[in-house]
């Protein structure tokens, strides 16, 4: 299927912790600089971009010199709180090199599930677009809870990115991962696994080919990405799942290059 993204005027890009934090726990400065360059280039072309960025926990572990995620929820929230500040500080610094202004929006599920707060969030996004600012979104990990009587967590930022794409009316969601796209089976296990270039619908076969958890720094696995694609389909939009190793590939994707997996319903 030929890809044409010429009509894309509003774009959501999601980047995961594994793309921002090296296996050693150090911050991937080169990757963040490339991402800022790409988003700034798109911004200069008149495309409105929202960046949904994981990484608060990974940055927090780095700042506090901790080797692994704490088991206690309170400490997890504290580490994420420290990491969010460090992450946004770096983003602000790097984007400023390209004369691009950024802002921080921290969301919880209850914000988008209640009409009044959702309207406020939409107004905030629209105002930022009008001001020429790139919103950087993350879940508010320091206060989010996952309890039956008051669940405020999205689950992971794959889902959050699909929700943000719906909230802002994005023409396209690009999800950067540590894998090249959706394969017919797990490429880490099967050498003959084949990359699916195009997925027009989420079938039982597609669901069966997704499995496994995320990295030690993040939470998202392939199943969460498939569920995000389902949400994108429900909103009559489209999504590209691609490897985040080289953020400049985003520019090639928007030019029509067949990189990663395109989730788009047939016309």
Curated annotation (Swiss-Prot):
Q: ATP-binding: present as a keyword of the record?
A: yes
The protein's matches in PROSITE patterns, at most eight in alphabetical order, are given as:
GLUTAMATE_5_KINASE (PS00902)
The UniProt entry's GO CC annotations, sorted and at most eight, read: cytosol
Q: Span of the secretion signal?
A: none
Catalytic activity reported: L-glutamate + ATP = L-glutamyl 5-phosphate + ADP
The main enzyme category here is: transferase
The positions annotated for binding substrate are: 54, 141, 157
Checking CDD domains in the record gives: AAK_G5K_ProB
Q: Name its cellular compartments.
A: Cytoplasm
Q: What Enzyme Commission number(s) does the record list for this chain?
A: 2.7.2.11
Q: Which pathway is this protein engaged in?
A: Amino-acid biosynthesis; L-proline biosynthesis; L-glutamate 5-semialdehyde from L-glutamate: step 1/2
Q: Which GO terms describe its biological process?
A: L-proline biosynthetic process
| Molecular function in Gene Ontology | ATP binding; glutamate 5-kinase activity
- Residues holding ATP: 14, 177-178, 219-225
Which of UniProt's keywords are assigned here?
Amino-acid biosynthesis, ATP-binding, Cytoplasm, Kinase, Nucleotide-binding, Proline biosynthesis, Transferase
The family database entries (HAMAP family) matched by this protein are listed as: ProB
**What family does this belong to?**
Belongs to the glutamate 5-kinase family.
Q: What does this protein do?
A: Catalyzes the transfer of a phosphate group to glutamate to form L-glutamate 5-phosphate.
Q: What's the protein name?
A: Glutamate 5-kinase
Q: What species is given as this protein's source?
A: Streptococcus thermophilus
